[in-house]
Each structure stands twice: as C-alpha cells, then as structure tokens.
C-alpha cells in the first residue's frame, strides 16, 4: 500500500520522472498555473469554491467546510469520485494535490479511500512545489558554467541549440522565436507555466551532469514570457559564443521560418483561404509591432514590399519576393541593432564561428571540463 503522503523530498523525483498528478484545485486556479503531467479534476468548481471562500471569510472554517459538503453532495459527489477513479485507473501511480496540501487533498483522498482506492497526496501541495521550482531556477546559474549563444537574426541559433545536449531551449519553452516575427500559431504558456517548465528543463539538465549550461542570448521578454529576474541577470553576465552564417543562408532560413512554415501551419489549421488570410495578418501585424522603431517611411516601404510578396505568393505560388523585404528588414533593422548590442558586451565574447566550428569548440570545451 503506498504512503498516504508524498514528502517534499520527493519533489525532484516527481518532476524528473514526469509523475502523473491529479490537481483537485478549481479550474480557475489550474488555468493560472499548473505542472506538466497534471490533470485538473477539481473537488470544487469555480462557483462552488467562490461560495465556500465567501462563507469562510464571514463565518469561519467550520461553516465553510459544511457548505462545501452541501455543495458537493449526492450525484455531484459521485461524479467527482468517478472522474478521479477513472484517472487513477489509467494512471495507477498517480499522486494528487491541492493548493497547500490541506483540506481539499485530505478530503479527496478520504473519498477515494472509501471507494476502495488509495492515492497519496503531495505534502505542501501546489504552493510548495511551485516554490521548489522557483528555487531550482534561482540556483541553476551557480551549478555549472553558463554560456550564451548569440548571433545575427537568421543564423540558426535554435537549430544549433537543438543539436546540443548541454543546451536548454528557452524559446521552445516559451513557444516563441524571440523576434518581432517570432509568434507561433499556438499561444504561449502562462507566465507561471513558462517558469515551471523552465525549472523542470533545468532539473533534467542538472541530472545529466553537463559541462555547461548553454542558452540563447535572449532579451528579458521572449514574446510575452518574462525570464525570472535572477536568471536573466546571470545570463547578462555570461560569456558569449557568436554563431556566424552567410547572409544568403540567413535569408533563406528566415523565409522558411517566417513564410513557408507559418503559411503551412495556418493552412493546416484553418484551410487554404482562411489560412492565407491569417498568415498575411501574422506578417503584417508583426511588421506593425516595430513600426515606431522603423519609422513611418521605412515601415511603409517594407509593408509595400511585403504586400507585393503576398500577392505574388497567392497568385503564382511563388515566395521569392519575400526575400526582398526580409533582406531589407535584416540590413536596415535587425543587423544594426544586433551589432550595437554585441559591441556593448564584446569583452564577454569567447568565440565566433560557423555551426561546424562552434560544435568543435564546444566539444573541446566539454573535454577540458
């Protein structure tokens, strides 16, 4: 028979082993932030939780508990128990948790036990596990050397990182490619979920005992996902590797990312007509987001070129004109901005080179650690 309570010392194992977890908090709590491999099967729905909370403030704990039992009773109670039982049947090693590992966890566990099902609940609940993950992020930069991978837009930093076992892909976790055109079709995670997933990725990285932690040289915001301040500060002090690629390679890579992949993704999701409309809006809105920094005249020039490229794409199935506005965007906006930023931190640059040269340098760095 499993232990009735999962101790805080097991948090690391829970996250590393992707342990299935039953989150019995209300849906509104789950939506704000949750853990990977958790499923929301609430003891109380949002409206029920709100009523119990109001009762607690006005009349105290015992009255609130009594109200909770009256709200979740009879057929409603039976439906909740059946949903939990079904989850446990599919996930026999599941744990459960509420916000603090208190009454909701204990009551859920008790009702399941009365139905003949033993499920341990996690000590401290969501709040304690969340604090644990925040601690992981804060400690990570002190665990091993931190290296920051930089390079001009389109040089393939993400492609490179995905080939390196010592790397953590921040943009993948944020579901955003970092630039003004970096939005993906699916939405970004909530800020809390971004931080939780980052912490778990760092836990896995530490488990594998790598020679360094390799990250892309990101801004504080990746789309709308904010890097935790202490982690970002450590990144700002890290030594830098600069990835270099020919302009032609960068252009074609960006056309593939901004145009081919996004167009295909929108069409798969929405169909050809609606997909092209959504794809066009994505490009034009991305350009609009940097209008102030471009200036009105330069923005208008790029917008006209972009519209011409879209017209040719839809009429002739030809994406070659997209290279024109991408080239202009690189050389009038992204490249000067990057060069200015790199110059300010040039004293931290350890190495510059191509993909192959960078792999060789990192392999050698690994062997010397």
UniProtKB/Swiss-Prot annotation:
Protein's name in the database: tRNA 2-selenouridine synthase
Stored SUPFAM superfamilies: Rhodanese/Cell cycle control phosphatase (SSF52821)
Catalyses which reaction(s): 5-methylaminomethyl-2-thiouridine(34) in tRNA + selenophosphate + (2E)-geranyl diphosphate + H2O + H(+) = 5-methylaminomethyl-2-selenouridine(34) in tRNA + (2E)-thiogeraniol + phosphate + diphosphate; 5-methylaminomethyl-2-thiouridine(34) in tRNA + (2E)-geranyl diphosphate = 5-methylaminomethyl-S-(2E)-geranyl-thiouridine(34) in tRNA + diphosphate; 5-methylaminomethyl-S-(2E)-geranyl-thiouridine(34) in tRNA + selenophosphate + H(+) = 5-methylaminomethyl-2-(Se-phospho)selenouridine(34) in tRNA + (2E)-thiogeraniol; 5-methylaminomethyl-2-(Se-phospho)selenouridine(34) in tRNA + H2O = 5-methylaminomethyl-2-selenouridine(34) in tRNA + phosphate
Family: Belongs to the SelU family.
Enzyme Commission numbers on file: 2.9.1.3
Classification via HAMAP family: tRNA_sel_U_synth
Cross-referenced InterPro entries: Rhodanese-like_dom, Rhodanese-like_dom_sf, SelU
Alphabetical UniProt keywords: Selenium, Transferase
Source organism of this protein record: Shewanella sp. (strain W3-18-1)
Domain Rhodanese: start-end pairs: 15-138
Function statement: Involved in the post-transcriptional modification of the uridine at the wobble position (U34) of tRNA(Lys), tRNA(Glu) and tRNA(Gln). Catalyzes the conversion of 2-thiouridine (S2U-RNA) to 2-selenouridine (Se2U-RNA). Acts in a two-step process involving geranylation of 2-thiouridine (S2U) to S-geranyl-2-thiouridine (geS2U) and subsequent selenation of the latter derivative to 2-selenouridine (Se2U) in the tRNA chain.
Taxonomic lineage of the native organism: Bacteria, Pseudomonadati, Pseudomonadota, Gammaproteobacteria, Alteromonadales
GO MF annotation: an example: tRNA 2-selenouridine synthase activity
One GO term (biological process): tRNA wobble uridine modification
Xref: Gene3D superfamilies: Rhodanese-like domain
Subunit (UniProt): Monomer.
Active site: 98
Transmembrane segments: none
